[in-house]
Amino acid sequence: MSGRNNNKLPTNLPQLQNLIKRDPTSYREEFLQQYKHYLSVIEIFKLQPDKPNKELSTLVMFMAQTAHCFPQYLEDFPEQLKSLLRVHHTVMDPDQRMTLCKALILLRNKNLISPSVLLELFFELLRCQDKLLRKTLYTHIVTDIKNINAKHKNNKVNTTLQNFMYTMVRDNNAIAAKISLDVMIELYRRNIWNDAKTVNVISTSCFSKVTKILVAALKFFLGKDEEEKKDSDSESEDEGPTARDLMVRYSTGKKNTKNKKKLEKAMKVLKKHKKKKRPEVFNFSAIHLVHDPQEFAEKLLKQLEASKERFEVKLMHMDLISRLVGIHELFLFNFYPFVQRFLQPHQREVTKILLYAAQATHHLVPPEISQSVLRTIANNFVTDRNSGEVMTVGINAIKELTARCPLAMTEELLQDLALYKTHKDKNVSMSARSLIQLFRSLNPEMLQKKFRGKPTEASKEARIHAYGELDAKDYIPGAEVLEVEQEKTEEPEEDDGWESASLSDDDEDGEWIDVHHSSDEEQQEVADKIQAMPAEERKAKAATVSASRLLSQEDFKKIRLAQLAKEMNNAPGKSVKRKNIEIDSDEEERSGELLSLRDIEHLHKKPKSDKETRLATVMAGRTDRKEFVRKKSKMNPHASSTNKEKKKNKNFMMMRYSQNIRSKNKRSFRDKQIALRDSLLKKRKRLMK
């Protein structure tokens, strides 16, 4: 009898729903009967909206599941649900409210509701004190907007939603404003709303009075963009000379120490230039899309000066301001004295503040301001009363600051810092050497003669520009190599292609001799010819090449290879005094927009760990190990301890006059041997069992 009752369609809605989806026309009457019942239940619910109505929830889900089968009867159904939620969402039962929202999501997935109207309602429902509902609505909003823009960007819907979201971000309800901000950030990260309007709406949240909203907006501008990181990893490595090109060039010839060192030097220079071209993985695009970065940075600084937030939030403010100033090259002179107040070795998170000071420096900052910051760092950090780590951090910060603004360094201060090259602390001396290496490429004339190193073509051309001076070139530096190569190929070949070979005295020492390639000899001849040219003639040839022909990728590759050679070749007229120039690949200057904390905190020599750190490392390595002590199991676990165990725990003063102790101390060497033998035999028998 119970099975027969289950088959009655008016009371068994899941079965009726299944049948309607299969054959809608045959079950129209049953559907209309349920629809009329739904209308009556709606009227009853409106009388007491604060009380849960399970029957209404069941009917609403039934109507939502079958709405696509009878669209002519359910035209007003979505509007009825929206009006119920709009009017009664504050007093409605949470489960009832969730059911109505799920029904609307189901109708939206079937494309029976326009997205703009529904999403506006859902944004209003974010004010509800229901965490599960807010999470569901957040997921649907992000997914729905993603699906709307899947094939192509729907600008009409996007504009409507962005305008509405702009009001929601400024809503008085902190929870609704925070979730609206999270939606915009998520859509930007998914590359759906990545336009300037979205970024500038998010930027307004940086001035919110609610700390959670403020921190979320700051993190958006400071966070890393993972998609950009993946793109940079998959970037083609074919541009420019490769390591294989250098290997081929320097492997042709005798395998001696001189060629090996030349190859190592060339590989270091290549690595340096690869690092310069490597794109940053920070979220630059958002910072670049800010409409008025100068006004934005000024407002942030004003808010920072009057802020009473936690120190971590202040650090985020300083980080964002420094990035804005450094990337957009802004004039924000009040920021530098504010940062200088925190430049003390005992200051909390001082390495980050040093990073922000270097990050906010650029070549347009007046020298008197940047020199003040540099002098503060030198006076507070690079003194003998501080530890080696503090001095190292200070020199690293000075190096990064002067790499961005060379005019900040004075000749007197540079000579004082260069003397730390011979400091007893390895970290300090290596940091000072990296600073010397930086100025060998920027302006060797500021260094003392003993610190300048072997001059190269690149160092001869190095010059620090005056404040505000532009270095605009009407030619591509290094393009003269193309014209010289062309002249070389046009020369008539006088030889018949055969060369005589003889065993020289240098080759009789048993070393391997490789056949010289004609292409390598030609490249060396071209390099020698360019090196012998005066600077003006080089510029003239480079300008002629740049203006008279279109350069291919192969041409640019040759130009870059020639520029690399300038950093290796000796200056004209200089003899080879040193076989190799030391280049620390970890401490090379970078031309990126942002710095990393490792640039400031980098220590060449790892500091010794204290006892607590070593002990913590040892204990961490023992987490997966089992105890090696063999536990003796008793036949009866509840039995009392033996006399032997009691002896071990007995006070020594009670045992010192016992016969066993006295006889033990008076044993002869022979007795001890016998006792040792017996104990070893016992252990052996125990192991053999």
UniProtKB/Swiss-Prot annotation:
Pfam families (alphabetical): SDA1_C, SDA1_dom, SDA1_HEAT
Chief localisation class: nucleus
Record region (Disordered): 485-512, 606-689
Basic and acidic residues bias spans: 668-681
Bilayer-crossing regions: none
Residues forming coiled coils: 254-319
Location within or outside the cell: Nucleus, Nucleolus
UniProt keyword terms in alphabetical order: Coiled coil, Nucleus, Protein transport, Ribosome biogenesis, Transport
InterPro entries xref list: ARM-type_fold, Sda1, SDA1_C, SDA1_MD, SDA1_N
Any one of the GO BP annotations: ribosomal large subunit export from nucleus
PANTHER family per UniProt: HSDA/SDA1-RELATED (PTHR12730), PROTEIN SDA1 HOMOLOG (PTHR12730:SF0)
Family to which this protein belongs: Belongs to the SDA1 family.
Record's function text: Required for 60S pre-ribosomal subunits export to the cytoplasm.
Name the UniProt record assigns to this protein: Protein SDA1 homolog
Gene from which the chain derives: sdad1
